[in-house]
Amino acid sequence: MSANISYLVNPPTEVGSSIPADTEHAISVTLPTWKSNVGYEEGDPNVTTKMKSGYPRFFISAHVKDCISIIKKFPEIEILKLKDYDMFLYPSLSVAKQSAAFLESKGPIDSAEVIIYDATKGLRKHLDSIDRNRKYTEEIHIPQVYSVLFPSKYFGIAKQFWQHTGDGISSRRAAAFLHSYKKIQSISEFLVAQRSISHLKSKSRSRYASHPDLQALNTWMTNEGNQANDEMEDVSLYLEERYGRNLDLSLATAAKLVLRRRIAGTLKDEVDLQKALPKEGSQYLREVKGLSHDDVFLFPTGMSAIYNTHRILRLVLDDSRKSVCFGFCYVDTLKILQKWGSGCYFYGLGNDEQLDEFEKRLESGEKVMALFCEFPSNPLLNSPDLVRIRKLADSYDFAVVVDETIGNFVNVEVLPLADVVVSSLTKIFSGDSNVMGGSMVLNPSSRYYSRIKDAMKALYEDLLYDEDALTLERNSRDFAERSQVINHNAETICNLLYQNPKIKTLYYPKYNTSKEHFEACRRENGGYGGLLSVVFHNPEDARQFYDKIQVAKGPSLGTNFTLASPYAILAHYQELDWAGENGIDRNLVRVSVGMEPSEHLKNVFINALS
């Protein structure tokens, strides 16, 4: 069995272990039983204290926690003598200000209680104080990090912004900040020792060779130097093994250009980032005239793409109008539409009957700013009637934003029917479950194109950390091929589940009542995607199936390996009745099918159902 196959078919099983196993920047966590999922939601220490990783918008990673601990000890922070204060970390001043504004708008908090601190500037100040001429620290690059400090009693409100927007710093950015800090500290100690040696030399040159303090300092400096060299060799080795090259700004810039071209559908073949990039080719995937990589914008997460799309639309359209969430979209999408702007109308079922209701609302004179939907939706895999929605948008003047994460542009073509398409690159585009990212694609044929494009030129910040971009580029090179394998495997499993008497409902685009709407956008060689959900006749069967199935079990989707979760428990534990009213059974099990050998997967599901 090859190493790759072994990695796919031997999932981690220990509560709290990372998914993938032993991965520094893993974005999922093992919750192997139904009980452990409930325990996580209820804060059971038997679960929470064992968590080595978690989904990054819900779980503060160890690297980020370490950054927070260090920044709290910076002189500029310590001098404030703050008591009972917490902080979140962001990659730009603009995002930090947005976080502060959200805090002040949602809680009874005085603006003076919210402090924005440039942690990068603070670390540079320390660097300059020890090595002003940069003799020893010339090559140290400190990534941009801002901290937003606030009284601990407002932690819940502050976390809402961090979670919903997805604009917190990534674990790789945090790790780089920590590495810079440790390097500067080591150099600082080295220079102190060097000055001590110089002082001792000047005081007693004749006793230099035998002075015990001086000998100790020389020994310390030698050890520190060797340790520093070893650390740098380890880092270089890691980068060479992981990327086959050293990371630098020029490669990151090239990687981001490749990503944008790949997402625009104008780059089919792999490229060498160290060589000149080929000119942008013609469309081979997207079917929108005039589309180029200049219409693609990258973000640190998928939710950041959605949040910023909504933010830009509020600036260029009529912000006094509400938005529409059509269909049961991912929880944070709805929260963004509800908590920013003028609110939203929620059509949770997202079916033709609710589209009739929406049309009647428009006919009555109600005006809306934008309609947000997923194609298909998560976790019910329903497909809205995009053709009809486009006609309504043209008639009643509102923007259409489609999240294509689940369908992905290998399988479906939704951009011609949308003004903006967003996606989480964290999912199948990456596949490796070790990096976050998001994208926004503008439709050049949209009536709002010029306004949105001008606003993006003025306000867009590239906050996708360079190393994250390099990781995404590497992971996504075989995106199209992986999608086809996963399409095949998912259909194979659905054919198996569809015939099983224990299954009450199978949710999959091929079998859903909204199939005709999916087919209207499906590419000629496209499949139905890798995500499916099942509801059992007997809730106990759902729990037994989840506990027994031998696949990775935790949050997220779109992974190269099969990943299962009791979706309603994880995403809506505090609002299960409300979720049920919108079609989400509390015992629903969601499965993201991976690239394991088909026969292996069939046996895994047969055993879990037996």
From Swiss-Prot:
It is found in: Cytoplasm; Nucleus. It comes from the Eukaryota. Pathway: Amino-acid biosynthesis; L-methionine biosynthesis via de novo pathway; L-cystathionine from O-succinyl-L-homoserine: step 1/1. Catalyzes the formation of L-cystathionine from O-succinyl-L-homoserine (OSHS) and L-cysteine, via a gamma-replacement reaction. In the absence of thiol, catalyzes gamma-elimination to form 2-oxobutanoate, succinate and ammonia. One of its GO terms (biological process) is transsulfuration. The modification N6-(pyridoxal phosphate)lysine is found at K427. It is an enzyme of class 2 (transferase). This is Probable cystathionine gamma-synthase. It comes from Schizosaccharomyces pombe (strain 972 / ATCC 24843). Keywords: Amino-acid biosynthesis, Cytoplasm, Methionine biosynthesis, Nucleus, Pyridoxal phosphate, Transferase. GO terms for molecular function: cystathionine gamma-synthase activity; pyridoxal phosphate binding. It catalyses: O-succinyl-L-homoserine + L-cysteine = L,L-cystathionine + succinate + H(+). Its main location: cytoplasm. InterPro entries: Cys/Met-Metab_PyrdxlP-dep_enz (IPR000277), Cys_met_metab_PP (IPR054542), PyrdxlP-dep_Trfase (IPR015424), PyrdxlP-dep_Trfase_major (IPR015421), PyrdxlP-dep_Trfase_small (IPR015422), Trans-sulfuration_enzymes (IPR051750). Belongs to the trans-sulfuration enzymes family. MET7 subfamily. Its EC number is 2.5.1.48. Its cofactor is pyridoxal 5'-phosphate. GO terms for cellular component: cytosol; nucleus. The keyword rRNA processing does not apply.
